[in-house]
UniProtKB/Swiss-Prot annotation:
It comes from the Bacteria. Together with its co-chaperonin GroES, plays an essential role in assisting protein folding. The GroEL-GroES system forms a nano-cage that allows encapsulation of the non-native substrate proteins and provides a physical environment optimized to promote and accelerate protein folding. It catalyses: ATP + H2O + a folded polypeptide = ADP + phosphate + an unfolded polypeptide. GO terms for molecular function: ATP binding; ATP-dependent protein folding chaperone; isomerase activity; unfolded protein binding. Residues 526-535 have a biased composition (Low complexity). NCBIfam families: GroEL, PRK00013.1, PRK12849.1, PRK12850.1, PRK12851.1. One of its GO terms (cellular component) is cytoplasm. This is Chaperonin GroEL. Belongs to the chaperonin (HSP60) family.
Amino acid sequence: MAKELKFSEDARSKMLAGVDKLANTVKTTLGPKGRNVVLEQSYGNPTITNDGVTIAKAIELEDHFENMGAKLVSEVASKTNDIAGDGTTTATVLTQAIVNEGMKNVTAGANPVGIRRGIEKATGAAVDALHKMSHDVKTKDDIAQIASISSASKETGKLIADAMEKVGNDGVITIEESRGVDTSLDVVEGMQFDRGYMSQYMVTDNDKMEANLDNPYILITDKKIANIQDILPLLQSVVEQSRSLLIIADDITGEALPTLVLNKMRGTFNVVAVKAPGFGDRRKAQLQDIAVLTGGTVITDDLGLNLKDTTIDQLGQAQKVNVTKDDTTVVEGAGSKDQIAARVAEIKGQIEDTTSDFDRDKLKERLAKLSGGVAVVRVGAATETELKERKYRIEDALNATRAAVEEGFVAGGGTALINVIGDVAKLEAEGDEKTGINIVLRALEEPVRQIAQNAGVEGSVVVEHLKGEKPGVGYNAADNKYEDMVAAGITDPTKVTRSALQNAASVSALLLTTEAVVAEKPEDNPAPAAPAANPGMGGMM
């Protein structure tokens, strides 16, 4: 297909239009008085959300060049979400501010490479300043406050604080849909290990790119599966019972994996394959832990067991299994409580006996997975639309809380970004590099300005007021007053704020140094739509 090219100012202006269209949609959701956005779905009811990355991913612009600009901003939101789990709207606002200020200067004749150096220098100084002002998460109240701010709900904040208290800061917390209208917290026996699906075609939820199996059988083996015939009798037994299957194996190679994927895509049965966790003796021990938890048997040569002879009775079972590209979570395994307790006691004995600190840490990790359980937040709502919106908020709050536990927290509401302006302004530079620093200085004001505007207040007035306040004092948009943000419990995870700024600066600098854009050329005479099928030919394939 022929390509269409645009250069210099023409290229940048088109991409800027795309940046603005996406950012103007996303930034209306920022802050406690931000609005929602309604997204049309290809099927089912529309989705109502204020989640920045969800909105960004949903936007496709008709103009190819504008769409490329929009997709670059969407990439900023996605990357921030992947790293920190929240802060996607802030990242979008920062990107728009840097790109707009940068484009003005490039159009006026500034060298984009010099501007890029200045942006990178200023961003580094801002991140260093953020780390210096960061507070550590010390109490349950700290966790509740961070989760409350992210979800705009004190009830959600308390729920997540309770969940983390029960399973620990590093514990496994999953979010499920409830059948009722109430949102509740349960702690169930479960385990998570760091292995994801072998093929993305095994996912059941394309939006989140994860596979969810309800009441599955679980095949646990330390063998490689290269020939589908080795497990064909077992697969047939699983299909006969209309159950899904999780396969945990050393590896699946040859024609076995494509065959499993093909049957999954055809709807023959629901199957997900993951590699066994760990290596060597630790792998054997972890597989045995999974077997005990799920009531299954490890199919291994050590026990003289073959895959061809494996029966349904040797498979483990669980209430639910969730598999992402990185992790597998098994919830409510069908194992005997007595056997689980015995396994826990055995691991505790090994912890006492070992002389290796490394081995002790690994044993404690296994013990936590086996005995700590999984906290399950069951989200309830009156309608499906409300349920999705509430679920997005709780997921954001959980991600924000984990980020805060990892790197601490700073004053919220964009206050921390205002507070680092002084450190960035001290940087020495000349020419276009100085211009790049000034661009970042202006962008650091933008989140506060947007939060204020969404609350119906003049943003520039708020920004100028905060510049004259002592560090930590910010604008509480919910109550329309200035106060010490940390003391008021209005905080943001340092990791979220840092990631939003770094990702925004990175993509913006690349966009400013773009000189040519190549896109697919629209067809002048698109092919006519296929005629409707003859009603008399029904049933033919």
